[in-house]
Amino acid sequence: MDHLPIFCQLRDRDCLIVGGGDVAERKARLLLDAGARLTVNALAFIPQFTAWADAGMLTLVEGPFDESLLDTCWLAIAATDDDALNQRVSEAAEARRIFCNVVDAPKAASFIMPSIIDRSPLMVAVSSGGTSPVLARLLREKLESLLPLHLGQVAKYAGQLRGRVKQQFATMGERRRFWEKLFVNDRLAQSLANNDQKAITETTEQLINEPLDHRGEVVLVGAGPGDAGLLTLKGLQQIQQADVVVYDRLVSDDIMNLVRRDADRVFVGKRAGYHCVPQEEINQILLREAQKGKRVVRLKGGDPFIFGRGGEELETLCNAGIPFSVVPGITAASGCSAYSGIPLTHRDYAQSVRLITGHLKTGGELDWENLAAEKQTLVFYMGLNQAATIQQKLIEHDMPGEMPVAIVENGTAVTQRVIDGTLTQLGKLAQQMNSPSLIIIGRVVGLRDKLNWFSNH
């Protein structure tokens, strides 16, 4: 280990930055956030430093560097574009046993600045030891996505509860289980974010007083249309906290690779016209796992409330008194259209969008007359096997045969395939495609040649 990671208490302690440009300004922000009593020395300063000085937030010393500026300092930063001056600052600090950071010169520095994820009081620092700042930044960005923005408020509140929790729960195991419940409780986090004292008190009392072997909960999570990058941050957080993940065929392998490693995985894949696991059995799986006290994630492709039967599953849980929540996902219509260069609405071509299930059941005739109207976009989910019927019905109700259509297979994935044509060709086009596919019908499809960005990558 070349560097020891430490967190310094700098509040009301003298610190010095030598340099008055943009780089020095970024370092100054960090020290000001930490409450340091900051002096900045340079021949000239960018306007931000002047504004801070006018507000009484720091002291400016205009002129050449004077080593006496270090006499009362706990920490120094050399942030000029003059390598010789930076080296002089570093040597003067070293002689006084003051830690000094030299920007872009880690070998000349006695400490380096990490990439920081700030969820105060929770802090995470990432460093590559100065060898690859870009790598450290990328890791920080990834960690940022994993740590909810409200986490700091929850951590601060947990500190206030420590005494009571110690009195309430006799063993370390009981306390650990309580803290695990508290840190994943979305209602408490939201209440803290909203400063809703009544809800904070109610939720805290419920968590403290309920038995530790309480029933579990189910979180319905939309996995998006395929590209793992389209999974929401909250969806990612939920699948990494799950004890059990119940997932279907439309959830990509890339997304399943993000699931917590020791979570149980239950596959309940479905295909149009055939159910690997009957819906009622899926409902019972969710119920059974939650009743064991487990945190269950029901992971569905797209958005669970758009042709995902999410409402049916939640009704079962509601009737059994099982707590549940929902994390929306990007629905296939949005993802597939965007990755195909087809805007669902357009000022000149479509003022509305219809999302329609392609599972056309006997006795469930659609309103084809309204669907055939102009100035709208039709998106058929699971309509591949019914493409010829869709073509026939729309033409019978006076939709022009030259109306542009597109079929998107494996939308947003690297294996995405799109074919387009006209309504009179829809049935034949569908024979060339495989499930999962989405059918888009409307004038907006004509913009695909101009706006198709994804296939050009």
From Swiss-Prot:
Pathway membership:
Cofactor biosynthesis; adenosylcobalamin biosynthesis; precorrin-2 from uroporphyrinogen III: step 1/1; Cofactor biosynthesis; adenosylcobalamin biosynthesis; sirohydrochlorin from precorrin-2: step 1/1; Porphyrin-containing compound metabolism; siroheme biosynthesis; precorrin-2 from uroporphyrinogen III: step 1/1; Porphyrin-containing compound metabolism; siroheme biosynthesis; siroheme from sirohydrochlorin: step 1/1
Question: What residues does NAD(+) bind to?
Answer: D22, V23, L43, A44
Question: From which domain of life does this come?
Answer: Bacteria
The family database entries (PROSITE patterns) matched by this protein are listed as: SUMT_1, SUMT_2
Q: Which GO terms describe its molecular function?
A: NAD binding; precorrin-2 dehydrogenase activity; sirohydrochlorin ferrochelatase activity; uroporphyrin-III C-methyltransferase activity
Q: Where is the active site?
A: D248 (proton acceptor), K270 (proton donor)
* Family annotation (InterPro entries): 4pyrrol_Mease (IPR000878), 4pyrrol_Methylase_sf (IPR035996), 4pyrrole_Mease_sub1 (IPR014777), 4pyrrole_Mease_sub2 (IPR014776), CobA/CysG_C (IPR006366), NAD(P)-bd_dom_sf (IPR036291), Siro_Cobalamin_biosynth (IPR050161), Sirohaem_synt_dimer_dom_sf (IPR037115)
Q: Could you tell me which Gene3D superfamilies the record lists for this protein?
A: Cobalt-precorrin-4 Transmethylase, Domain 1, Methyltransferase, Cobalt-precorrin-4 Transmethylase, Domain 2, NAD(P)-binding Rossmann-like Domain, Sirohaem synthase, dimerisation domain, Siroheme synthase, domain 2
Binding positions for S-adenosyl-L-methionine per the UniProt entry: P225, G301, G302, D303, I306, T331, A332, M382, G411
Which Pfam families does the entry mention?
A: CysG_dimeriser, NAD_binding_7, Sirohm_synth_M, TP_methylase
- Positions of the UniProt region annotated as Precorrin-2 dehydrogenase /sirohydrochlorin ferrochelatase: 1-204
Catalyzed reaction equations: uroporphyrinogen III + 2 S-adenosyl-L-methionine = precorrin-2 + 2 S-adenosyl-L-homocysteine + H(+); precorrin-2 + NAD(+) = sirohydrochlorin + NADH + 2 H(+); siroheme + 2 H(+) = sirohydrochlorin + Fe(2+)
Task: PTM Phosphoserine: list the residues.
Answer: S128
TM ranges are: none
Alphabetically ordered keywords of this record: Cobalamin biosynthesis, Lyase, Methyltransferase, Multifunctional enzyme, NAD, Oxidoreductase, Phosphoprotein, Porphyrin biosynthesis, S-adenosyl-L-methionine, Transferase
Described by its record, this protein's role is as follows:
Then it catalyzes the NAD-dependent ring dehydrogenation of precorrin-2 to yield sirohydrochlorin. Finally, it catalyzes the ferrochelation of sirohydrochlorin to yield siroheme.
Annotated family = In the N-terminal section; belongs to the precorrin-2 dehydrogenase / sirohydrochlorin ferrochelatase family. In the C-terminal section; belongs to the precorrin methyltransferase family.
Protein name, please? Siroheme synthase
